[in-house]
Amino acid sequence: MTETTKTHVILLACGSFNPITKGHIQMFERARDYLHKTGRFIVIGGIVSPVHDSYGKQGLVSSRHRLIMCQLAVQNSDWIRVDPWECYQDTWQTTCSVLEHHRDLMKRVTGCILSNVNTPSMTPVIGQPRNETSQPIYQNNNAPSKPTAAKILGKVGESLSRICCVRPPVERFTFVDENANLGTVMRYEEIELRILLLCGSDLLESFCIPGLWNEADMEVIVGDFGIVVVPRDAADTDRIMNHSSILRKYKNNIMVVKDDINHPMSVVSSTKSRLALQHGDGHVVDYLSQPVIDYILKSQLYINASG
């Protein structure tokens, strides 16, 4: 399978991130590594989407603080970014609506429809036109033949002037080499792109709680988009999925990260990081990156038990 025939993926994580922990970032890294190892996917970007203030969770600090902490946590990443759209809405948004927003945003920016799990495009990839020197579409010093997340997401996020997109009758993106001489011949490459929800096994297990999730939303989340699950505390994801008819129905759309890394809940837990802050526990450095800790102390967050 070539680079262009692999499915290109953007991982989207929704949550309180109150505060964002090292474990949250590790989930992105582990998910990307696992998807790459399958040989079927190329992860080109990750999106952290903090929940709206009206979510109403006890101890939830304002989105202004949570957005800044998330930005500090990913400031050295070349492929994970923080998106404020969910926080900037008038009220709380469902996970389903956040996924749909990002799908529709990509569609508006590129003029194409994103592929989803159930209807992948089967059209052959468009290659280089004849009589044209073979040259990688995406270039950087380290990997001249591979797209970089920063460049592709930058293209999507900046403006249409940085992306030229044809409108094929299939669910594909077409990125055009911005350095090509468009006056003579256009070099282009077609890739399939999906947005997948990244979550821990605790969120997957919450799908099994009657009445907690809207069933129509679950159908869209799992059936149309798909989920990448990072197990926590050796969770039995097969047992979890067997407890939900919707999860069983779309089991093939749920990718469980399988690796040899121990990923205890405490590493990800925002609750334990807040407790460590309140108690002056030096082990807070195990949970939070130093820039996040510095911001929390400067802003006097989580000092009181009330948050």
From Swiss-Prot:
Cofactor descriptive note: Divalent metal cations. Mg(2+) confers the highest activity.
Membrane-spanning intervals of the chain: none
Pathway membership: Cofactor biosynthesis; NAD(+) biosynthesis; NAD(+) from nicotinamide D-ribonucleotide: step 1/1; Cofactor biosynthesis; NAD(+) biosynthesis; deamido-NAD(+) from nicotinate D-ribonucleotide: step 1/1
Coiled-coil segments on the chain, per record: none
Gene3D superfamilies: HUPs
Keywords: ATP-binding, Cell projection, Cytoplasm, Cytoplasmic vesicle, Golgi apparatus, Lipoprotein, Membrane, NAD, Nucleotide-binding, Nucleotidyltransferase, Palmitate, Pyridine nucleotide biosynthesis, Transferase, Ubl conjugation
Membrane topology recorded in Swiss-Prot or TrEMBL: Lipid-anchor
Lipidation (S-palmitoyl cysteine): C164, C165
Compartmental location: Golgi apparatus membrane; Cytoplasmic vesicle membrane; Cytoplasm; Cell projection, Axon
Tagged with keyword Lipoprotein: yes
InterPro entries assigned to the protein according to its UniProt record, in alphabetical order: Cyt_trans-like, Euk_NMN_adenylyltrnsfrase, NMNAT_euk, Rossmann-like_a/b/a_fold
Keyword Nucleotide-binding applies: yes
Residues reported to bind ATP: H24, T271, K272, S273, R274
Enzyme class name: transferase
Pfam families for the chain: CTP_transf_like (PF01467)
Cofactor field: Mg(2+)
EC number from the UniProt entry: 2.7.7.1, 2.7.7.18
Predominant location category: Golgi
Job of this protein: Nicotinamide/nicotinate-nucleotide adenylyltransferase that acts as an axon maintenance factor. Axon survival factor required for the maintenance of healthy axons: acts by delaying Wallerian axon degeneration, an evolutionarily conserved process that drives the loss of damaged axons. Catalyzes the formation of NAD(+) from nicotinamide mononucleotide (NMN) and ATP. Can also use the deamidated form; nicotinic acid mononucleotide (NaMN) as substrate but with a lower efficiency. Cannot use triazofurin monophosphate (TrMP) as substrate. Also catalyzes the reverse reaction, i.e.
Family to which the UniProt record says this protein belongs: Belongs to the eukaryotic NMN adenylyltransferase family.
Subunit structure: Monomer.
Protein name: Nicotinamide/nicotinic acid mononucleotide adenylyltransferase 2
Gene name of the encoded protein: NMNAT2
